[in-house]
Amino acid sequence: MKTTFLDFEQPIAELEAKIEELRFVQDDSAVDISEEISRLAGKSQQLTKDIYANLTPWQVAQIARHPQRPYTLDYVREIFTDFHELHGDRTFADDLSIIGGLARFNGQACMVIGHQKGRDTKERAMRNFGMPKPEGYRKAKRLMELADKFGLPIFTFVDTPGAFPGIDAEERGQSEAIGHNLYVMAGLKVPLIATIIGEGGSGGALAIAVGDVVQMLQFATYAVISPEGCASILWKTAEKAPEAAEALGLTAHRLKALGLIDKIVSEPLGGAHRDYKGMAAMLKRSLAESLRQFQGMSVKELQARRYERLLAYGKFKETGTQD
């Protein structure tokens, strides 16, 4: 699959195009230009390192939305075995913007739940662009309760612009569905490990992300509103999105510093979309480490730990005195 380059990656795109051109010439020529190709490849790699070492929050937001970025089902295929998808909320419908089902993680039975976007126009419409309606969140709740009943750890994968804001979703109780999920997750008797893999958009993300461990991929985002939405409210124009992204503090490193997430999972050079298998391998190791800490922990200990964790959000902390 040919890589799609973002606007700020155009210098890299130009180098990669030159490399491809030289490779094509080498195939049809007796002249050996492999050294020049290697030199340009090294230059491209260094340029990628330099650009990705100095990303702005707005650029990170663009990477989190990259159309080739791995989605939940991509990770399910690489990380889990024996995945069996479960459908429907048993109340209204089956929302395909959230997928979930039984699987095995390193041989252990578990429940997997996540947002799912689409790759092409037809699939994006089918998945509602990764924006769940109430039936999607109620499906997730049903699967969480099923996992709780059978003592299965839960892995959730967050990647949504936000909950669907349509009239039909509001009529069917969007806020109630999200709120009920928060209530259920807070009281689970099994560990829940949440990973923000792309966009973490407001309550639509939080509805499957009240975890005992919350981790983010290096170039994922997590915020109460999109940069464009914030800019439209504060400055009446979406053109101020870069400034809004800075103010929102939506990057993994910023959120880790604030204590809102627990771990950051490094991504391959150039982002997760450059190396699906490499990204999945790193994420699998991180998930295994997170799950291991709950081995032998009683339900009482697990819930007490979660209770303390949730109460710690938003605590005011004195850092010094002023004269």
Curated annotation (Swiss-Prot):
It is found in: Cytoplasm. The keyword Lipid metabolism applies. The gene is accA. Signal peptide: none annotated. InterPro entries: Acetyl_CoA_COase_a_su, ClpP/crotonase-like_dom_sf, COA_CT_C. Pfam families: ACCA (PF03255). Belongs to the AccA family. Pathway: Lipid metabolism; malonyl-CoA biosynthesis; malonyl-CoA from acetyl-CoA: step 1/1. It catalyses: N(6)-carboxybiotinyl-L-lysyl-[protein] + acetyl-CoA = N(6)-biotinyl-L-lysyl-[protein] + malonyl-CoA. Its EC number is 2.1.3.15. It is an enzyme of class 2 (transferase). GO terms for cellular component: acetyl-CoA carboxylase complex. Keywords: ATP-binding, Cytoplasm, Fatty acid biosynthesis, Fatty acid metabolism, Lipid biosynthesis, Lipid metabolism, Nucleotide-binding, Transferase. It comes from the Bacteria. One of its GO terms (molecular function) is ATP binding. Coiled coil: none annotated. The keyword Cell membrane does not apply. Acetyl-CoA carboxylase is a heterohexamer composed of biotin carboxyl carrier protein (AccB), biotin carboxylase (AccC) and two subunits each of ACCase subunit alpha (AccA) and ACCase subunit beta (AccD). Residues 39-293 form the CoA carboxyltransferase C-terminal domain. Component of the acetyl coenzyme A carboxylase (ACC) complex. First, biotin carboxylase catalyzes the carboxylation of biotin on its carrier protein (BCCP) and then the CO(2) group is transferred by the carboxyltransferase to acetyl-CoA to form malonyl-CoA. This is Acetyl-coenzyme A carboxylase carboxyl transferase subunit alpha. One of its GO terms (biological process) is malonyl-CoA biosynthetic process.
